Regions:
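Alpha-helical linker/edge segments of TPR/alpha-solenoid repeat scaffolds
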Residues: 2, 71-74, 98-110
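Structural marker of alpha-solenoid helical repeat scaffolds
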Residues: 15, 48-49, 65, 82-86
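Structural register within alpha-helical repeat arrays
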Residues: 25-26, 59, 99
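Residue at a conserved register position within TPR or TPR-like alpha-solenoid repeats
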Residues: 29-30, 63, 83, 103
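Structural motif corresponding to the intra-repeat A-B loop/turn of tetratricopeptide repeats
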Residues: 32-33, 66, 86, 106
Length: 110
């Protein structure tokens, strides 16, 4: 029997529940089928692996989609702060663009 991607990730998680990449992959995989579980894994990353910069964009976007606007704004801001501290300017730029769009500040030239 072949394991599904989710089953494989859950096995990896059992082997090493502190691995940030596995937690991130689980959050992403659950996003397709169970946003509540996805949110739990993103929140785990935010709490236990605050320097895992990739989390912030997706977690903030999920909060926004769930109507949790205040939480989305906090996560975008924290992500920009962390990515700048880490010197990850690519992530900072992506977060800043997403934040500006979220805030309605993504002006287009007409």
């Amino acid at each position: 029997m072949t394991l599904t991607r989710l089953e494989q990730l859950l096995e990896f998680y059992k082997e090493d529940p502190s691995d940030a990449y596995t937690i991130y992959a689980l959050a992403t995989e659950y996003l397709k089928i169970d946003t509540r579980k996805s949110k739990e894994y993103y929140e785990m990353l935010l709490a236990e692996h605050p320097n895992y910069v990739g989390t912030y964009y997706h977690a903030a976007k999920l909060y926004d989609e769930l109507g949790q606007k205040d939480e989305a704004e906090k996560v975008y801001k924290k992500g920009m702060q962390i990515s700048r501290q880490e010197g990850n300017m690519h992530a900072f730029s992506e977060l800043q663009q997403a934040y500006n769009k979220f805030m309605g500040l993504d002006y287009e030239d007409e």
